[in-house]
Amino acid sequence: MAQTGTERVKRGMAEMQKGGVIMDVINAEQAKIAEEAGAVAVMALERVPADIRAAGGVARMADPTIVEEVMNAVSIPVMAKARIGHIVEARVLEAMGVDYIDESEVLTPADEEFHLNKNEYTVPFVCGCRDLGEATRRIAEGASMLRTKGEPGTGNIVEAVRHMRKVNAQVRKVVAMSEDELMTEAKNLGAPYELLLQIKKDGKLPVVNFAAGGVATPADAALMMQLGADGVFVGSGIFKSDNPAKFAKAIVEATTHFTDYKLIAELSKELGTAMKGIEISNLLPEQRMQERGW
């Protein structure tokens, strides 16, 4: 039987990242820039989402050499992505000793029917969600941390805003319901009934929910924090900008001081050009990464 980390320990590890910024990096140099800027963790991968989107084809787990290079370069936690449903990619990353695994829609799904049973792993998992149904299904499978799916690699915050608002609105609805209404709501959402009961009792999700997918500026990061995010993932936004080190520090500061508008104004000055954005309506249905997973 596989050894498993306890739910409390894995969720506690995710709670420790609360209020922070997690940055995508593709090598040791970028990882050091992220750490020096104040990132609470880094996500090691071969290509940032914008490049994955541009290249097309099948996107897989990163070469273990890249993941190890990043792990050896920094003292902060290191995450890595596995394809949805790819048991062996996840086991390989766990064996390598990564701190978290992201079962990610940014990569090409390996299984179109089943997500990983994340309860069987010692390593904590982060998963994307667009609504409370997706959020609770991932938690039931063992996710210790959630993030909005947004629309990765676009530099467009609109989908992350939509997903964060939707999850939070649905949580408020569940909290306001009487217990005898919850079973029907569970059916409508495709959500485990016991988890909805817990959300009603606690008044919140049982795990942290970060913003991700389209964060490109300090103001974007601050916006997501104001909407109730527990922290921020930045994928392409930093290392696709003109001045990655400056952008990274500015996004960390804006995430921490998300209601200090004068500071955010100062942080936003002379940053250089942000990453080139993509209008969501211009994406074909098969190009929408957020549609992956169920």
Swiss-Prot record:
InterPro entries: Aldolase_TIM (IPR013785), PdxS/SNZ (IPR001852), PdxS/SNZ_N (IPR033755), RibuloseP-bd_barrel (IPR011060). D-ribose 5-phosphate binds at D24, G153, G214, G235, S236. Keywords: Lyase, Pyridoxal phosphate, Schiff base. Changing K18A: Almost no effect on activity. One of its GO terms (molecular function) is pyridoxal 5'-phosphate synthase (glutamine hydrolysing) activity. Changing D99A: Results in 20-fold reduction of activity. This is Pyridoxal 5'-phosphate synthase subunit PdxS. It comes from Bacillus subtilis (strain 168). The gene is pdxS.
